[in-house]
Curated annotation (Swiss-Prot):
Coiled coil: none
Listed name of the protein: Cysteine protease inhibitor 10
Cross-referenced Pfam families: Kunitz_legume
Native organism: Solanum tuberosum (Potato)
GO MF assignments: cysteine-type endopeptidase inhibitor activity
CDD domains in the record: beta-trefoil_STI_CPI-like
One GO cellular component term: vacuole
UniProt family annotation: Belongs to the protease inhibitor I3 (leguminous Kunitz-type inhibitor) family.
Amino acid sequence: TCHDDDNLVLPEVYDQDGNPLRIGERYIIKNPLLGAGAVYLDNIGNLQCPNAVLQHMSIPQFLGKGTPVVFIRKSESDYGDVVRLMTAVYIKFFVKTTKLCVDETVWKVNNEQLVVTGGNVGNENDIFKIKKTDLVIRGMKNVYKLLHCPSHLECKNIGSNFKNGYPRLVTVNDEKDFIPFVFIKA
């Protein structure tokens, strides 16, 4: 088991303007690869509340600007108001919602390994982390990958998969398999 070293301050995560990501600020999470797009929330199963975490693509039915997210710290003592590399955060869609669906905006991973909403801030299994990548993508800087890091289990990369006709975010078992992300201030 590794413990956080109190004296170790991890590097900040940066958006496309070169500014550190701030807790509680709104961002669009975007896959910068050609043909890919921003992450968004949608209802694809006739559910009471939308809960699918999808990725826009450069094809007509999947075009779009994305749904803003906010990052929430795991605990108040976590490194001030900036998001840092490999530090536990909760990811929450910033959307207008009904009273009924107000608790359906925090990301989690379901039994099918799909990223969905319905997570809870405070639930150790709904934690995500951000890791820097070495990818060089033209016109982009600060390219990262997202990891799902449930309590007592190994972190898994977030990748994408077409499931039931939709580009879904999923966890993947292969360390080399992931989709890159950049963060754009919303």
